[in-house]
Design a protein with these regions (language model features):
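Active-site beta-loop-alpha junctions enriched in small/polar residues
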Residues: 8-10, 34-36, 68-70, 95-97, ...
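Alpha/beta enzyme core
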Residues: 18-23, 73-90, 94-104, 115-197, ...
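Glycine-rich, positively charged N-terminal anion/phosphate-binding segment
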Residues: 8-84
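Alpha/beta catalytic cores of nucleotide-metabolism and tRNA/nucleoside-modifying enzymes
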Residues: 1-9, 15, 119-128, 132, ...
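Short, charged, surface-exposed secondary-structure boundary motifs
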Residues: 39-41, 171, 230-236
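Conserved beta-strand positions in the central sheet of alpha/beta enzyme cores
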Residues: 29-30, 64-66, 91, 162, ...
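Conserved phosphate-coordination/catalytic loops
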Residues: 69, 111, 115, 175, ...
Length: 256
């Protein structure tokens, strides 16, 4: 299975990721989310600040750049930039509950606008070319709605969909509901989709992550807050440098 480091705003910057890469490297890392609108519209100083969030070192690879926007053309442009910068994948954020992000029609609010969400995936694909596209989302907005939300996203054939096992309304106030990650896997299988499903939410360590994989059938787990105070979180594998077949398949990496 794939064990990934979750994107966390004001946490998973380049310096933080370098420390994690040194002491316990996950199979793949995500950047903090970056505003595709800002990259398109910000004055020079603001754009330079955003570009700092897209800095990385070879030690952090494979690494995925995450963007948020509600405008497909800007997603396409951001994806094209990420490809130019050498990222291994591009992620579209469709789960962030931040009000300022939602007011832009981005983040979690996209779960209420599946047509636009699909257009953003298409736009990211156009900009990315041969680089894999992924989506990070939740099980629903006010209530679980995977049945009507996920199939539409899967039709766009992203390489990976990460499902945070809570609704937007629940934020992180209730325990993650991993039965919905299992349902996401079932929906994927029913559609005979090749998209990988990662689960996310309340995973304490790699043993816990492996249990979640067994319980749900998901292809891997994204861990976030468990890294706090524990840079060795991912250093529990027999060979932390080994790239799994699943990672190779999702991010087009050669097997080592």
């Amino acid at each position: 299975p794939i064990f990934a480091l979750a994107p966390m705003s004001d946490v998973t910057d380049a310096a933080f990721r370098r420390i994690i890469a040194k002491y316990g490297k996950p199979d793949v890392m995500w950047t903090e989310f970056v505003s595709a609108d800002g990259l398109a519209l910000a004055p020079k100083e603001g754009k330079e600040k955003l570009l700092m969030n897209l800095q990385y070192t070879e030690a952090e690879k494979p690494i995925v750049a995450q963007f948020f926007t509600s405008i497909p053309e800007r997603m396409e442009s951001a994806a094209r930039l990420a490809k130019k910068l050498g990222f291994d994948g591009i992620d579209t954020n469709m789960g962030c509950p931040d009000r300022s992000v939602e007011k832009q029609g981005a983040g979690a609010s996209l779960m209420k606008n599946v047509e636009l969400a699909c257009e953003l995936v298409k736009a990211a694909k156009r900009g990315a070319g041969d680089i894999p596209i992924s989506v990070k989302t939740r099980i629903g907005y006010s209530k679980p709605e995977l049945e009507k939300w996920l199939p539409e996203i899967l039709k766009e054939e992203p390489a990976v969909v990460t499902v945070h096992a809570r609704t937007r309304k629940e934020m992180s106030k209730v325990p993650a509901r991993w039965e919905f990650v299992k349902r996401a896997v079932e929906i994927r299988n029913e559609m005979k989709s090749k998209t990988l499903i990662l689960g996310n939410g309340d995973v304490k360590n790699l043993n816990d992550a492996m249990d979640k994989v067994k319980e749900t059938g998901c292809d891997g787990v994204m861990l976030g807050r468990a890294i706090f105070g524990n840079p060795w979180l991912f250093n529990q594998k027999e060979d932390i440098a080994r790239k799994t077949t699943e990672v190779s398949r999702a991010w087009d990496l050669p097997d080592s």
